[in-house]
């Protein structure tokens, strides 16, 4: 089964839907794509292989799907915030977001990776800094 180490609850709600740190839907998508590309390059430099990006499945979206050198599937949520206000980038992955990511990941895993272990990571960009949180949450967290 897909698993990861337990993590403390991130507290707070998902990021606001309207306005937010990066206003404008088109601009938000472009900004998001830029951060996802930077996260992908960062992870590839650390030995993970790219599998897929922006996979929409079962009502959720997987920002990045990577594969570790040991064959483990790594589902990566990419978040960006200009500052740590309201808890910052990592804390913005609230239980609702985790639930959507987990549902999509488990469906992807069943179709493409059953038999392989998997984990859920977060790459958080905040005030120009990148943090890679391995095993950020578990499939049974949400």
Swiss-Prot record:
GO terms for molecular function: nucleic acid binding. It holds the Pfam family UPF0102. It comes from the Bacteria. Belongs to the UPF0102 family. This is UPF0102 protein Bcep1808_0248. It comes from Burkholderia vietnamiensis (strain G4 / LMG 22486) (Burkholderia cepacia (strain R1808)).
